[in-house]
């Protein structure tokens, strides 16, 4: 098993390394045809922003105020605030820098409770459009991970909360590493593979182990009027807490996009062995969601998550139900503004000590440009 994983890692690493090393010379070898227009190498830079804001009522559980009264917690929050700086040095070299402004929650920190500035993305990108399919590239630095970024492009309600696999702690949206992306010809799908520190963007590397991730997506009927939005995705992540202490995630996903509805189903299998002496935990779960849409901006959101966190404790389950109504304001281009009124109910079964139901009602707002 270890020999097989080592072979996979060597092949994946070789692919990424060759892509990165070959980018510059391959681009230099391409000579535009006599009648073609040379690519635009004018340096460009643009600045954008993303804001997630909400007003949330925590109906359950109640909280106790300073006088010992049991009260319903209500709060205005800024869940996320990004400043996106993107640009091109030439038509083949691009970059992105995205600081993330979020609330510090570390106990004992001098800024506990304050909004703090940290780095979410900072990477260089080599575009291979000159000699590969359009949309092929390699990245180096702190960047989006293959699965979360892909799924957030289909499930548009990140401003309500993270996708199932990230919310349950199995994946992160960003990590430091190198990756390669390739679009299949004729819009049949794409492949995104990379090697990462594995500690996510919120922590430094702590040992010699790396996380190897690969996502492959197939669009079986790209020419069909009604089924071109159907995609089947497989994802695998093999990392280690330490040598021989596996941290593995496998996901099978089916998604569908249409003018009037987006929908998806994910099945997750995750294994963790925290250290040599610890038993391996085996988690299994799934999520299903649908977002019916109208042509006048109104959308619905319905989502159900289920996770069995450890096969050795079969009575333990976590479930979450999300339902809401959203209005997406009409804009030109890639600008997005939306308001979402939603209900979020999480239950916990079989845990010791027992955990209370967490029920939230909220108004979420999104601004992205």
What is each model feature region?
Residues 40, 209, 217-310, 319-320:
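Detector for outer-membrane/organellar transmembrane beta-barrel domains
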